[in-house]
């Protein structure tokens, strides 16, 4: 396996060096007798920066779905009142509806 890898690397390096040598040998050097052309204008492209979002606390990011937690909590009752609310409820019996005199 190592031999195959070594052969592949050697072949790739050999091809790239041969291609580089061929490229440099065939490119003629520019002659100095040509007149200089005006340099091309370079255009500078400015990047458009987006406004940074407002920073939030980490807890606000995690719990943004719990909007119900901000509502007013119900009144707290004593523990005994919670347990015995049904036993000691003083409900008055329903009065019959007053009948109009006919």
UniProtKB/Swiss-Prot annotation:
InterPro entries xref list: Acid_shock
Pfam family, one: Asr
Propeptide residue intervals: 22-58
Disulfide bond annotation, renumbered to this chain: none
Spans through the membrane: none
Keyword Phosphoprotein annotated: no
Entry protein name: Acid shock protein
Modification after translation (UniProt): Proteolytic processing gives rise to the active protein.
Keyword Signal: yes
GO CC field: periplasmic space
Primary localization: periplasm
Organism of this sequence: Escherichia coli O127:H6 (strain E2348/69 / EPEC)
Residue ranges of coiled coil: none
